[in-house]
Amino acid sequence: GSYLGKYRKTHIPQVAPGFYEKYFFKPGNLGYPVFDTAYVKLGVYICYDRHFPEGWRALALNGAEYIVNPSATVAGLSKYLWELEQPASAAANGVFIGAINRVGTEEPWAKQMGEFYGSSYIVNPRGQIEAQASYGDDELLVHEIDLDMVREVRDTWQFFRDRRSDLYGRLTEK
């Protein structure tokens, strides 16, 4: 293949003891690029980014049809959100989402951090999970998607057309 570009994780977490990403990484500054592949217009939204709906919308408005969200997320509060946020984001933006999470533990921090819960899945633009991997096994999830569904859902719901960006100024203020 060839190099298409890069995305840098936009939101850096500091949410749990022993989880110090903010000490090692700076927030990304490249915006929300979409990459034209031979098969799909692809967006990337990394791990903790998924908790911020604005980025999903920016990727969709930039033309993404399929957005991948690679993650390394452990059990606890985020498991419920894992099952909720990405289907809701797919439906709100008329995109497919590949929700990718690792499995197992990371030594020597396993006792402190817990277990990564896998459960990767592919969700369609209607917010329905079409394929899902298991909680604890290393797996390769392969699934064929129907890109016509992106246009169909966007044409039906018209969420982009009916946005009221004139009223959303507060969303971009600090």
Regions found by a protein language model. Give the residues of each.
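Short Gly/Pro-enriched turn/cap motifs at secondary-structure boundaries
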Residues: 23-26, 110-112
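Active-site beta-strand termini and strand-to-loop segments that position acidic
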Residues: 35-38, 125, 145
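Soluble catalytic domains of enzymes that build or remodel membrane lipids, polysaccharides, and related
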Residues: 4-6, 34, 98
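Glycine-centered tight beta-turn/hairpin loop motif at sheet-sheet or coil-to-beta transitions
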Residues: 1-2, 18, 39
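CN hydrolase (nitrilase-like) catalytic-core segments centered on the catalytic cysteine
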Residues: 41, 47-140
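Cysteine/selenocysteine-centered motifs that mediate thiol-based redox chemistry or coordinate metal-sulfur cofactors
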Residues: 30-62, 150-174
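A short, polar/charged loop-to-alpha-helix boundary motif
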Residues: 9-24, 137-155
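Short hydrophobic alpha-helix segments
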Residues: 1, 5-7, 133
